[in-house]
Curated annotation (Swiss-Prot):
The lineage of its organism: Eukaryota, Metazoa, Chordata, Craniata, Vertebrata. GO terms for cellular component: cytoplasm. Signal peptide: none annotated. One of its GO terms (molecular function) is 2-oxoglutarate-dependent dioxygenase activity. Its main location: cytoplasm. This is HSPB1-associated protein 1. Residues 1-25, 347-412 are annotated as: Disordered. It is found in: Cytoplasm. Keywords: Cytoplasm. Residues 88-208 are annotated as: Interaction with HSPB1. The keyword Lyase does not apply. Residues 356-369 have a biased composition (Basic and acidic residues). Widely expressed. Highly expressed by Sertoli cells in testis (at protein level). It comes from Rattus norvegicus (Rat). Interacts with CRYAB and HSPB1.
Length: 479
């Protein structure tokens, strides 16, 4: 798809679904859309759901007029970084207006101002994680132009949303979000998403350095991996899709993702949807914060910026982190009590009262990395022309859904098929078995062994370990 200097404008969607009087009807009611979102265990693209959103016109040029010269922070990165991920701690930052960004993106011959040090052919710029409540603090009326209520979340709008504006090559390193699931509305330009399921976590080499609350990074540059250093990555099952204007991508809980801009200008809007599992995840994150801050501060108390992500304002004291942990544990118990009161009103077959352990088991059963609940999709698949699954097969076809946002079809004209549930379960079990057998029983030590603080932290705050610690904390306090 050709794109001009400003980038691709949002496309007009085809009027395929009409009501009795000729008005356009969305393929899913809010109730049905929410039901689908809460039951899906794999990424999928919603089509024809945002044709009436005022925010569909939010090109970067339009937003530059709305913001009226307001400065925002851009992350500057190199277009080529080899096999090493370009973490945010390795980037530089520029405060500029959208007008200055668009000028830099279009005309290098007359460039001046904050971007003058950055050669457009070598650098990309990304205004990422821009929360509406901060960006539009004096223009709150624009919140209503984003209508997540159409997906079954009444009252949810721009106030709970984040804006992303980038140039060609701008990307976020591969990571998973600790909380919630994600809805992403592509407004302008195209973005390519590389996604990996939660059960592939051992193959993604997770790390918490740089540290950012609620983000687990991968040590791998997934678009140019170092397979000698990270051989297990070959076992990961990449799901790749190109998101076009007018489409909304659903990213389930704990799915790894690397996102890159394919056009000169891209604009996206997203919202993280809270889930029941987040209550326990907050305990896990509090444990992680305490361990990372304690060990890294002791190692290098004078240079926190070497390990702290720029999104984190400052490192916190042990006392403050202890308060975070206790607050998270108390909040979990408060949630259990409220849930217990609700369940007490419903008759139970065995007459027993639900306990904390039961709530933990329920949350674990809802974990997308488990096999429980995976059969829901098999009973009644919601997929069709307006809801297209992102599967490994999409990657084999060269990244389906790349062209026309009207139909959400692959290049060969066929809709992407869902990976059969039984096959998905078998692949998941096989991957976990391989992960457990990957290390030799008696590993051979190299000639020189040096265990760094980061090496230790990679073990201590591995997602599997922090989940176990959080569960032990909850169980210990509930006895």
């Amino acid at each position: 798809m050709e794109a001009g200097c400003e980038g691709s404008s949002p496309q007009t969607l085809g009027e395929r679904t009409m009501g009795e009087e000729g008005e356009r009807v969305k393929p899913f009611t809010p109730e049905k859309a929410k039901e689908v979102i809460m039951s899906l265990q794999q990424p999928a693209i919603f089509c024809n759901m945002v044709f009436d959103w005022p925010s569909r016109h939010w090109t970067a040029k339009h937003l530059s007029k709305v913001l009226e010269g307001k400065q925002i922070r851009f992350r500057m990165g190199l277009r080529s970084t080899g096999t090493v991920p370009q973490f945010e701690t390795e980037c530089s930052y520029v405060d500029a207006t959208l007008e200055e960004f668009l000028a830099w993106n279009c005309d290098q011959s007359r460039i001046s101002g904050p971007f003058k040090k950055y050669d457009h052919s070598k650098f990309w710029a990304y205004a990422d994680y821009k929360y509406f409540v901060t960006l539009f603090e004096d223009k709150t009326d624009v919140f209503q132009e984003v209508m997540w209520s159409d997906f079954g979340f009444p009252g949810r709008n721009g106030q709970e949303s984040t804006l992303w504006i980038g140039s060609l090559g701008a990307h976020t390193p591969c990571h998973l979000d600790s909380y919630g699931c994600n809805l992403v509305f592509q407004v302008q330009g195209r973005k390519r998403w590389h996604l990996f399921p939660p059960e592939d976590t051992p193959f993604l080499y997770p790390t918490r350095i740089p540290y950012e609350e609620s983000s687990v990074f991968s040590k791998i540059n997934v678009v140019n991996p170092d397979l000698k250093r990270f051989p297990q990555f070959q076992k990961a099952r990449r799901h790749m899709v190109t998101l076009s204007p007018g489409q909304v991508l659903f990213v389930p809980r704990h799915w790894w993702h690397y996102v890159e801009s394919l056009d000169p200008v891209t604009v996206s809007i997203n919202s993280w949807i809270e889930l029941e599992e987040d209550h326990l995840a907050r305990v896990e994150e509090a444990v992680t914060r305490m361990l990372v801050c304690t060990l890294k501060t002791a190692e290098d108390p004078h240079h926190p910026r070497t390990w702290l992500n720029p999104t984190e304002v400052e490192e916190t004291s042990h006392e403050v982190n202890s308060c975070y942990l206790n607050s998270a544990v108390c909040a979990f118990f408060d949630h259990c009590e409220r849930a217990k009161e609700v369940e007490m009103q419903a008759p139970r077959a065995n007459g027993e009262e639900p306990g904390v352990q039961e709530h933990m088991e329920v949350e674990q059963a809802r974990d997308p990395s488990s096999d429980v609940g995976a059969g829901k999709q098999e009973a009644a698949s919601p997929f069709g022309p307006d809801l297209v699954p992102v599967t490994p097969a999409s990657e084999e076809r060269g990244g389906a859904l790349e062209g026309d946002s009207q139909e959400c079809t692959s290049r060969n004209g066929e809709h992407c098929a869902e990976l059969p549930c039984a096959r998905r379960q078998q692949a998941s079990k096989g991957a976990r078995a391989e992960a457990g057998q990957s290390a030799p029983r008696y590993p051979v030590a190299p000639s020189r062994v040096f265990v760094s603080t980061d090496d230790l932290l990679d073990c201590l705050v591995n997602p599997q370990v922090t989940r176990m610690v959080a569960q032990l904390l909850i169980q210990g306090k509930s006895l």
